[in-house]
Amino acid sequence: MHNGQIGGFEAACKAADMLIPDALYRHRRGAIDSEAFFLVALGNGLATDPIGAIARTIATFEALATKTPKFRMTSAFSDGKILYAARYASDGFAPTLYHRWSTLQKGRAVVSEPFDAVCGLWQEVPDKSFCVFERQRVQITTL
């Protein structure tokens, strides 16, 4: 999941494509920033160093941005056991990101907006943060 924008991405699309490793480029299906960001993050070591890969990819895409807002994003991804999420904006206006543990469902949800009436149970992820959710354990690190 990715929500956000890269200022001037239409002008930086080719440069972003060039950052995707050859072995991963065959998986590129569209021309959107989310897909390029994810493939570059995979090339930056997302499978073995999620926080490092996201931090490196954010820095790379922030440098590609040519217009204001330079870079705004939230993302969430999983290896099937651990859920990861990130929230970041170069201008302090990051898209919203919330998480919540459900005792009933025995799982965690990460969403851009709370989807039920029990808003008090949702916790907002701070801007410039990387999250690791493993069952009920929550670790939030500043990016």
Q: Where are the regions a protein language model picked out?
A:
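Conserved short alpha-helical segments that host acidic/polar catalytic motifs at enzyme active sites
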Residues: 2-143
